[in-house]
Amino acid sequence: MFTWTIYVSLLLVLAGTFLMNRNTNTDIIDTFKREVDLPIPAQPGPPFPLVTDYCDIVCGFGRGSAELGIPTANVPINQLPKGINDLDLGVYFGFAHIKTVDGQELSVETRRDGRTVVYNYGQYLSEANDDLSVLPMVLSVGKNPFYGNDFKTMELHIIHDFKNDFYGARVKFNILGHIRPELNYTTKEALIEDINIDIRTAQTVLATPPYQVFKQQL
């Protein structure tokens, strides 16, 4: 009887310790912590999640892929809900789903830098390659001060190995959390390093069950 009482008491102490240490609002990212990083709760909290309708994927400057090795999908700000337009400048994360636009012929558009891109409306996306699955992403909401932009852009880096471009396709996405504010950089290498940390942070958080359930929104 005495032994059983001690055993039960020990279980209660351990359970109490677990509950005291369990906080759904504590930061779950330790590995990639930087001074500028914001706390990421164990599950999305207000104002998240934010969800879009399907919006067009348009050409930007082409820097993400050509200069940084991190391709992005640009979306028009005027196609996004007000709650997303009102977000602070910075880096966010969530999930994205791309769909093709049927019945469109290939067309050529000119980027801001004067170069041309082919709009294929996603016709080369492959289900076999999981291109049309719900995928993790990081979102830059900002003016890209490193490049001296004076207007805000919305750029998604979808964390997936696409084999082809998909300008003209449509994307729907949710935003589940905020990684850090927008920063300026003295070197391109520092910018690339931070983006890669953002990507690893998003992958780590989005792989947890409380975040995985939000794939169902898309």
Curated annotation (Swiss-Prot):
SUPFAM superfamilies: Riboflavin kinase-like (SSF82114). Pathway: Cofactor biosynthesis; FMN biosynthesis; FMN from riboflavin (ATP route): step 1/1. Its EC number is 2.7.1.26. Mg(2+) binds at residues 72, 74. One of its GO terms (biological process) is riboflavin biosynthetic process. The keyword Repeat does not apply. It comes from the Eukaryota. Catalyzes the phosphorylation of riboflavin (vitamin B2) to form flavin mononucleotide (FMN) coenzyme. This is Riboflavin kinase. The lineage of its organism: Eukaryota, Fungi, Dikarya, Ascomycota, Saccharomycotina. The gene is FMN1.
